[in-house]
């Protein structure tokens, strides 16, 4: 059996880092971890080929070679996924589809032969059994949550690691919180399910033996969902492994703001090699936080919490949202000031949208305010419901935030604020990579010589070189990120 696995293309967004990737001669940020894991669940004697369309071109010969074409995608990849499905239909190729896009919107995919939905650990074996017996059904679903202690190691040999800036790894699924706009609990539940420490170490080993050295992103919905197990088992095991392997990876992940309440946890994460954590800040407006059921963010000094996490050597990357019912006309300036004061360099600001199945979508349906399905991209200047604030004022205010925070003056001011306060707790092991040396020279030319940010670039360049040389590579990385953010925001604004 010949199996073609296809990962559709991402559009050009803030999260794609397309304009930053060119500096390091990479094609995509992360490999398709879900498909690589699904590949490991298929029979070993099947021939498998994987095409990540963010890194390689999908040609008709690939489709014609396959007995089955497996497609996995998130909502933001829907346009590319639809194109792939149409091509497969035209070539009479049988399609197996799964992942968040198809799970949340299966009613739109009658042109897919087999929909294997929800978590693959549960539904895929049933499909494979039916396929072997010659009685496959169109749709496989489950209301159960998978036991991820049985999840196999990803088949990394199906992709070229050189195409990517970072590898990824999953330790847990689910989140204990229930923000009304978030579909994570719809897809994966509120009780965090975790892998064993043996699984985590085996996955780190697997990546290590591929020869990979550099960033590894833990893609968990909320890495600190189960703090007790993390502190007792997982982080000590990772710390020991990293020391034994001479710190080959730089780790980062996503977590909730209550990380700031646990000094031991922050200290352990820093010692284990974690360097950055993405946190959903959402809004400095207390009423908006209560509205979206984000109690962990309410009733606290958010900037103080961010600064505390950073003092433990963890860079905070932040997500922000505008468009809540309780947002007032001053919210745009308040978010801009908050981002600047906090020193959050990577600040992702999006418009509120209501994904399918969320509490927010259900409320808006009852209120008659839903307009269409969410595209999966909350930074594309579209909103899928009728907001309380005038739509034109909302979009204008949103554009003003982006034009301000991603302008060279404000962006580099924020970088300098962060760099002055930040002290990594763990010495970084330097891994010589010709692409990153090339990125330095490309940044000098594109940002330091011909870019509108050149004055700010050189100020950051020399300040870091002489004051904090240990952060020099991070400073250049931030400058490259700033270029990408500016390009995207200019394209929309």
Pin down the residues of each PLM region.
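Flexible glycine/acidic-rich beta-alpha junction loops that bind and position SAM and/or redox cofactors
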Residues: 10-16, 104-107, 226-228, 287-292, ...
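Structural recognition of alpha->loop->beta junctions
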Residues: 107-126, 268-276, 336-349
């Amino acid at each position: 059996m010949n199996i073609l696995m296809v990962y559709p293309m991402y559009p050009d967004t803030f999260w794609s880092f397309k304009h930053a990737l060119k500096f390091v001669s990479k094609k995509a940020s992360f490999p398709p971890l879900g498909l690589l894991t699904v590949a490991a669940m298929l029979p070993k004697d099947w021939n498998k080929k994987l095409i990540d369309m963010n890194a390689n071109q999908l040609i008709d010969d690939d489709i014609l070679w396959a007995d089955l074409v497996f497609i996995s995608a998130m909502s933001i990849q829907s346009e590319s996924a639809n194109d792939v499905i149409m091509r497969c239909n035209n070539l009479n190729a049988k399609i197996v589809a799964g992942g968040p896009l198809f799970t949340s919107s299966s009613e739109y995919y009658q042109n897919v032969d087999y929909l294997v939905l929800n978590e693959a650990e549960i539904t895929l074996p049933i499909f494979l059994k039916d396929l072997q017996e010659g009685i496959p059904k169109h749709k496989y679903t489950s209301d159960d949550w998978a036991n991820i202690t049985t999840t196999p190691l990803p088949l990394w040999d199906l992709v070229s690691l050189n195409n990517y800036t970072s590898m990824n790894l999953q330790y847990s699924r689910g989140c204990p919180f229930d923000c009304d706009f978030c579909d994570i609990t719809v897809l994966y539940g509120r009780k965090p399910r975790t892998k064993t420490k043996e699984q985590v170490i085996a996955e780190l080993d697997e990546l290590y033996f591929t020869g990979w050295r550099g960033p590894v992103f833990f893609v968990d919905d909320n890495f600190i969902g189960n703090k007790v197990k993390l502190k007792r088992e997982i982080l000590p095991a990772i710390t020991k492994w990293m020391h034994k392997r001479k710190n080959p990876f730089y780790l980062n992940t996503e977590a909730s703001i209550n990380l700031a309440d646990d000094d031991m946890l922050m200290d352990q994460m820093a010692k284990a090699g974690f360097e950055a954590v993405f946190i959903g800040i959402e809004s400095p407006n207390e009423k908006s936080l209560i509205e979206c059921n984000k109690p962990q963010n309410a009733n606290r000094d958010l900037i103080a919490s961010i600064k505390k996490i950073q003092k433990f050597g963890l860079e905070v990357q932040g997500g922000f949202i505008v468009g809540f019912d309780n947002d007032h006309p001053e919210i745009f300036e308040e978010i801009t000031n908050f981002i600047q004061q906090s020193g959050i360099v990577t600040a992702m600001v999006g418009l509120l949208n209501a994904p399918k199945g969320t509490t927010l979508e259900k409320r808006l349906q009852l209120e008659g305010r839903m307009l269409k399905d969410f595209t999966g991209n909350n930074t594309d200047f579209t909103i899928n419901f009728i907001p309380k604030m005038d739509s034109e004022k909302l979009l204008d205010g949103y554009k003003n935030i982006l034009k301000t925070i991603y302008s060279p003056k404000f962006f580099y001011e924020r970088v300098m604020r962060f760099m002055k306060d930040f002290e990594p707790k763990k010495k970084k092991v330097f891994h010589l990579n010709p692409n990153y040396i090339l990125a330095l020279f490309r940044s000098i030319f594109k940002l330091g010589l011909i870019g509108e940010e050149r004055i700010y670039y050189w100020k950051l360049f020399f300040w870091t070189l002489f004051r904090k040389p240990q952060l020099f590579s991070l400073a250049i990385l931030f400058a490259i990120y700033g270029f990408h953010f500016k390009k995207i925001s200019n394209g929309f604004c």
